[in-house]
């Protein structure tokens, strides 16, 4: 529920720094700031002044007043740029609270910007994405969403969809007309155009979601197959201990890297085998649990006979664990230690040949990983997307397919109903129709000062 009281929070990261910013927003923001500074503040002017708690000077700094509606939140906003010492910033916050403000909830400044139509929901989410971006590519894509690229795509779709709905519903409302609107080629062409556009947005959304969420890779295999060496090769540094002793990795080893700007969460697991060692057995249990969370499994093997590759299936190599691996997770067989072979086979299907120790084939493996999730570096128009966006687009796509079926069958009323459902799913992306629960969940994931 939107309350128009005045909120305050520190807008800069925790810890010491050269500058710390306290942000105030609400109807009393200006009067509180003028009490703190004992100055008359002009809109959009940087005023250098002392900051007081009644008559005691807390600090001095620059204060800027942004009057409504020309501010980030759409309300009166004041930003106090003081020295970046947490104790000083807390004193300023304390004085602000005494003058009638309250502490802001997580994401409340951006929530107010959304509720005051300064941002739509995809742009509001992009604020968090640009702050939390873990790669340059993710940051650039979040900036595209923030400037409205994603919203424009959805709004253009909605405009076409609403026009088509009007046309279809007109044919239902005026049955006395001799013209059969449903046989009009314009409807077929328009519906096909919407179908194709939703499919394009669906593909872009999935790539954008990868930039936000990243890809979780699990390294699985028998002991001493070279999983830890592969982790180090992918990470470009020594993250895991590598020895010739089987079972060296007894716990989960995690590494966060980027491949062509895509965040990768790589998890090296204990070698899968039956073991009487209590510690190793616990590591294997944790490995099995982590496998359930994977986007991809890299099954590392060095299964060679007489310098020839053995194309054994995962269920043959680790039969006692195979039934615990989810069937819907993609598995890539990474044949390690190819430097031991006289002749190296060509990569094919889900079989990639590498030498983690010699760094042979690592770039090919990286390309394979990205290709498996449908990510392409050639797409310069990717904007960041959330899992909820992907779900909404998937639902919209399912119902636009049903709409096409109803058009072919000549069922005007069912066609109109399917188009309405598509519209509702698209509206949920930009926040045209969103429940309070959904908004609360989205904005609670923000940092306090945003």
Swiss-Prot record:
Primary location group: cytoplasm
UniProt binding sites for GTP: 224-229, 243-249, 268-271
Any one Gene Ontology cellular component term annotated for this protein: cytosol
Residues noted as binding (6S)-5-formyl-5,6,7,8-tetrahydrofolate in the record, renumbered to the chain: 23, 79, 118, 450
Disulfide cross-links: none
Gene3D superfamilies in the record: P-loop containing nucleotide triphosphate hydrolases (3.40.50.300), Probable tRNA modification gtpase trme, domain 1 (3.30.1360.120), tRNA modification GTPase MnmE domain 2 (1.20.120.430)
Requisite cofactors: K(+)
Compartments it resides in: Cytoplasm
EC number, as in UniProt: 3.6.-.-
The TrmE-type G domain, residue ranges: 214-374
Annotated residues for binding of K(+): 224, 243, 245, 248
Alphabetized GO MF terms: GTP binding; GTPase activity; metal ion binding
Keywords noted in UniProt: Cytoplasm, GTP-binding, Hydrolase, Magnesium, Metal-binding, Nucleotide-binding, Potassium, tRNA processing
Cofactor binding summary note: Binds 1 potassium ion per subunit.
InterPro entries for the chain: G_TrmE, GTP-bd, GTP-bd_TrmE_N, GTPase_MnmE, MnmE_dom2, MnmE_helical, P-loop_NTPase, Small_GTP-bd
GO biological process: tRNA methylation; tRNA wobble uridine modification
Positions bound to Mg(2+): 228, 249
PANTHER family: TRNA MODIFICATION GTPASE GTPBP3, TRNA MODIFICATION GTPASE GTPBP3, MITOCHONDRIAL
Function text: Exhibits a very high intrinsic GTPase hydrolysis rate. Involved in the addition of a carboxymethylaminomethyl (cmnm) group at the wobble position (U34) of certain tRNAs, forming tRNA-cmnm(5)s(2)U34.
Assembly behavior: Homodimer. Heterotetramer of two MnmE and two MnmG subunits.
Family: Belongs to the TRAFAC class TrmE-Era-EngA-EngB-Septin-like GTPase superfamily. TrmE GTPase family.
Name of the featured protein: tRNA modification GTPase MnmE
Source organism (scientific name): Francisella philomiragia subsp. philomiragia (strain ATCC 25017 / CCUG 19701 / FSC 153 / O#319-036)
């Amino acid at each position: 529920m939107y309350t128009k009281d005045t909120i305050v929070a520190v807008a800069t990261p925790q810890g010491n720094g050269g500058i710390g910013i306290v942000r105030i927003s609400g109807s009393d923001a200006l009067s509180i700031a003028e009490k703190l500074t004992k100055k008359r503040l002009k809109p959009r002017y940087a005023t250098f002044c002392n900051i007081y708690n009644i008559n005691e000077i807390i600090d001095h700094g620059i204060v800027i007043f942004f009057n409504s509606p020309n501010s980030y939140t759409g309300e009166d906003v004041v930003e106090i740029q003081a020295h970046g010492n947490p104790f000083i910033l807390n004193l300023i916050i304390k004085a602000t609270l005494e003058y009638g403000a309250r502490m802001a909830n997580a994401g409340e400044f951006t929530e107010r910007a959304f509720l005051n139509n300064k941002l739509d929901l995809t742009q509001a989410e992009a604020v968090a994405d640009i702050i939390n971006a873990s790669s340059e590519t993710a940051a650039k894509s979040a900036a595209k969403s923030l400037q409205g690229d994603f919203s424009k795509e959805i709004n253009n779709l909605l405009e076409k969809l609403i026009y088509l709905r009007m046309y279809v519903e007109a044919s239902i409302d005026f049955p006395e007309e001799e013209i059969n609107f449903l046989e009009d080629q314009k409807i077929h062409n328009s519906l096909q155009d919407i179908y194709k556009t939703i499919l394009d947005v669906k593909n872009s959304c999935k790539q954008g979601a990868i930039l936000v969420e990243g890809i979780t890779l699990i390294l699985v295999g028998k002991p001493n197959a070279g999983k830890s060496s592969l982790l180090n090769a992918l990470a470009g540094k020594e993250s895991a201990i590598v020895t010739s002793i089987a079972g060296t990795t007894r716990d989960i080893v995690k590494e966060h890297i980027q491949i062509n700007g895509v965040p990768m969460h790589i998890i090296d697991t204990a070698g899968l085998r039956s073991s009487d060692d209590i510690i190793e057995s616990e590591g294997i249990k944790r490995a099995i649990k982590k496998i359930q969370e994977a986007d991809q499994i890299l099954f590392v093997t060095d299964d060679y006979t007489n310098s020839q590759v053995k194309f054994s299936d995962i269920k043959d190599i680790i039969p006692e664990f195979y039934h615990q691996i989810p069937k819907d997770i993609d598995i890539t067989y990474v044949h390690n230690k190819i430097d031991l072979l006289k002749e190296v086979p060509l990569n094919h299907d889900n079989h990639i040949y590498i030498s983690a120790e010699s760094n042979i084939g690592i770039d090919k493996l990286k390309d394979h990983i990205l290709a498996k999730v449908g990510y392409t570096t050639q797409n310069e128009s990717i904007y960041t997307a959330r899992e909820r966006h992907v779900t909404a687009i998937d639902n919209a796509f399912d119902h636009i397919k049903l709409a096409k079926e109803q058009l072919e069958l000549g069922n005007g009323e069912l066609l109109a109903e399917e188009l309405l459902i598509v519209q509702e799913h698209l509206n949920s992306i930009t926040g045209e129709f969103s429940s309070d629960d959904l908004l609360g969940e989205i904005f609670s994931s923000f940092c306090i000062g945003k």
